[in-house]
Amino acid sequence: MAGFEFSATNLFKFLGLLTPFLIIFFLLMSSVINQDLKALIYLLGTSVASLVNIFFMYLIKSTRPDDASPFCNVFTFPFTVNSEANERYDAPSMTSMFISFTLAYIWIPMMFNPPNTVNIPLVLTLSALLVIDIIAQHNQKCTNFLGSFLGTLVGFVMGAAWYGLVNSSGYQSLLYYSDFTGNKTICRRPQKEYFKCDVYKNGKLLQSSRL
């Protein structure tokens, strides 16, 4: 990375572009500690969203300027580089899409699932990370504001859609709506239980009923 200087400004830029990796690491560690598959479902959703984002990249074909910072190559997805022309597509922004997807996927379930408590500090933190990412990418010429806006739009729509898919499939336990709220108590309506009773006399079955 030519001309790189270790400074507070460069560290801020570097951490801003590393935000997607930090989010993945945090959610993976959360799943390891809690021994659940939530991070796997989340990563599957981000993979689908990335494919949709790459589709729009090839549709728009907005290329990154030659004087873009080397920091822009920290978070590079396959198929986002035009190998024939050696050009990198920059819209919709992949990092903005990723953070926005995470924001929607975590925030929306909090509003529509018990205990219906939104973790305001978490939502504000993710929103702040998104703003920092947009500013850092623009300053480093990784993309323009339109690319960041489109990435944010694609990410939020895909995050909401992925939540809807998981929620409607009956696997609400794989969502994050209760993990990051202050109240961990969740009440659900108990499911019906059935009992099968068999009546025998002298070793012969007289009656069988289900209660």
Q: Can you annotate each of these PLM segments?
A:
Residues 1-211:
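Terminal transmembrane helix and immediately flanking juxtamembrane interfaces
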